[in-house]
Amino acid sequence: MEPAQPKFQWGQRVRAFVDLFNDGSFPEQPEGALLAKTGDAGEVVQVGMHVETNRPVYLVEFAPNRVVGCLEDEIAPL
């Protein structure tokens, strides 16, 4: 399977398309905590690739010290 091309770029302003909850990968918050609510604005600070699925993964800074890993269907351009 060929890697998907990223839809969003570093530095791009985006918004949360859905509520984003901690899946356990955000150590400063309890699992299940709301990290960003639908409509919250943020900036893509890194673009990576999920190795198993060849899908882009975006690190989005929604607030100072609140960088959340997101898939394309979880964010939208501003």
Regions found by a protein language model. Name each.
Residues 2-78:
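Basic/aromatic-rich interaction segments and small domains that mediate binding to polyanionic partners
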